Amino acid sequence: KRISHAENFSTDLVHEIRNPLTSLKSASEILHETENHEQRTKLIDILNHDVQRIERLITDYSQMLKDEVALSKEKMKKINLKLIARSVVDDFNSIYEAKRGITIILNDLNNKEEYFIYGIENRIEQIIANLLDNSISFSDDNKKISVEIDKNENEMIILKVLDEGKGFRETNTKKIFDRFYSNRPDNFGEHSGLGLNIVKNLVDLHGATINASNNIAQKGANVEIIFPKS
């Protein structure tokens, strides 16, 4: 069982590092081509951020291997989901607007500055980054992705990621969160089937729920996370 845990964590780590490495590569390519000082400064910030993200991932997963437990609730604190979402969206836009013409929009449906949840900041960042990476992977060039933050009648905060991609082929969308499950169309290349499983595990860690569906009004997918009251 210990070997199985180690293998699972190692596989997850490889998958998680691949995302910031892709971002590093893209940012470095754009940095090499652009002469715009403001854009170069922003790209350098993204490079530094991704390096820190890789370092954090290695540290976190090493600790998980040692302890064979996820993160304890003692490490959680009250954090502003909107600020975290804005930071991740800005980083992704800096890369993918230039590289593929994909625009990510952050919509605050209640026009609030603060959406507090009880959680671990870098893990919430990881959730949003993985969802955006998944949407981008399924989207054609020059498409839009929306990140929506809302609060329901029970004062629970809702985070949604909606894209204009291929949507889910699977009618039972709960399966998409299974480890190694992939419903990616063949023309979208090889896919490990780990990204959404990692998201699901992190969502569970925060006592939140996650659901996926196809957009009814238009083509694309919709992933919704509901966080408990902080």
Mark where each language-model region is:
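Conserved micro-motifs of the catalytic ATP-binding
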Residues: 69-74, 114-119
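Short alpha-helical Gxxx[C/S/T] motif in the catalytic ATP-binding
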Residues: 195, 199
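A conserved beta-strand-to-alpha-helix junction within the catalytic ATP-binding
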Residues: 75-90
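Short conserved segment of the HATPase_c
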Residues: 168-180
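Short alpha-helical segment of the dimerization/phosphotransfer core of two-component systems
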Residues: 49-54
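Short helix-loop "hinge" at the ATP-lid/N-box region of the Bergerat-fold HATPase_c
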Residues: 135-136
